[in-house]
């Protein structure tokens, strides 16, 4: 009875158009991707530096009240839990109850007395080994 006829044929994208779009997306990913990853790596280094500064403030408060910095054996845990035999401890000296790991999932290193000051507090960076460059560089308190 009624017949609907199409005057225009439906068309999809041609193979050439799809290849051009994929090529443009690949170029964008190649140009923008490394820059985004660079900023993400820098953010982890900045986070480690801020955490080290927060630990440093807690260590200074510990020193003011107790009269010394925590020993290497007491470590950073002395900022959240009173070490045995310490009478003037009025902590916790950090907002968090647990000592966080560095942004790369490794423990911070603490040594007192330090080689570079009253104490040394540092992260070994992404590679978790001494030295390095860029995101692998050590983040230190001195």
Label every PLM stretch briefly.
Residues 1-13:
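N-terminal leader/signal peptides at the extreme start of proteins
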Residues 10, 42, 61-65:
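Conserved amphipathic alpha-helical interaction elements at protein-protein interfaces in regulatory
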